[in-house]
């Protein structure tokens, strides 16, 4: 019998995110699902829903709120305006500011529709339980993320490139890591690419577009997973008038155990 994690741990983590200094959430509340977030005016919501449906690997939708709501069934007592450690405010596709509290920005558009997107942090606990080190957690930093040259399928007014996260994995355990992550397709699932970063248009693994660089040791292979920062690449390319997102690596922690998504 598998013991479920204590929901109080998820609530405590969100409280820490709300009240504390912003920090990446990798390794926080292990055993609970973490999410990417994007909030758009209602006029853009259908375009994004279609964009996510056409690009399920980087944009797996776990919940969609009603217009104007800051609540989610994934954590009914949470507040999506305050319970992420760091938010990004976008205006005309340009990052205007980062803030630990999005309440004021949220009030600018009373019809915001929020999408919660699966995050690969969710399968990091099973990787660790299998004895596979997650390097950015071990180093106490953010996961490295890269903008690739792979186009997502466009939808309505939205288009953009796919973003990937990278984790160094010992060569002999790459297949195991792919199998473990592949059990959770709702949170990006198996890798989209293994080795050869240049095949994704990535020139330098020491210079991620988002997050922090991590050490790659001899005998390790860079493994790339589709990433929920992909919607932010679409914002930069498509330039909707307004959006709120999480800052890359600063996720929304839900009350849902990560085992819920395993198949």
Curated annotation (Swiss-Prot):
GO MF, any single term: lyase activity
InterPro entries referenced in this protein's UniProt entry, alphabetically: D-Glu_cyclase, Putative_hydro-lyase, UPF0317
Assigned keywords, A-Z: Lyase
UniProt keyword Lyase, yes or no: yes
Pfam families in the record: D-Glu_cyclase
Record's keyword annotation contains Lyase: yes
Highest taxon above the source species: Bacteria
Family annotation (Gene3D superfamilies): PSTPO5379-like (3.40.1640.10), PSTPO5379-like domain (3.30.2040.10)
UniProt record similarity statement: Belongs to the D-glutamate cyclase family.
Protein name as catalogued: Putative hydro-lyase Pden_0321
Organism whose genome encodes this protein: Paracoccus denitrificans (strain Pd 1222)
Upper lineage: Bacteria, Pseudomonadati, Pseudomonadota, Alphaproteobacteria, Rhodobacterales
């Amino acid at each position: 019998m598998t013991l479920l994690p204590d929901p109080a741990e998820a609530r405590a983590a969100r409280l820490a995110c709300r009240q504390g200094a912003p920090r990446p959430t990798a390794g926080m509340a292990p055993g609970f699902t973490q999410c990417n977030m994007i909030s758009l005016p209602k006029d853009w919501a259908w375009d994004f829903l279609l964009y996510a449906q056409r690009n399920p690997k980087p944009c797996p939708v776990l919940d969609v709120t009603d217009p104007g709501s800051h609540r989610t069934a994934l954590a009914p007592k949470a507040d999506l305006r305050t319970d992420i450690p760091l938010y990004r405010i976008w205006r005309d596709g340009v990052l205007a500011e980062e803030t630990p509290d999005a309440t004021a920005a949220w009030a600018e558009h009373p019809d915001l529709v929020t999408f919660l997107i699966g995050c690969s942090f969710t399968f990091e606990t099973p990787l660790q339980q299998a004895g596979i080190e997650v390097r950015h957690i071990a180093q106490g930093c953010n996961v490295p993320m890269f903008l690739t040259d792979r186009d997502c399928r466009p939808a309505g007014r939205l288009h953009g490139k796919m973003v990937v996260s990278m984790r160094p994995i010992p060569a002999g355990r790459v297949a195991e890591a792919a199998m473990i992550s592949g059990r959770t397709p709702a949170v990006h699932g198996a890798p989209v690419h293994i080795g050869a970063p240049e095949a994704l248009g990535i020139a330098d693994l020491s210079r991620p577009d988002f997050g922090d660089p991590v050490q790659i040791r001899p005998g390790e292979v860079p493994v790339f997973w589709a990433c929920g920062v992909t919607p932010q690449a679409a914002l930069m390319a498509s330039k909707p008038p307004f959006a709120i997102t999480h800052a890359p690596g600063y996720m929304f922690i839900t009350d849902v155990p990560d085992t819920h998504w395993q198949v």
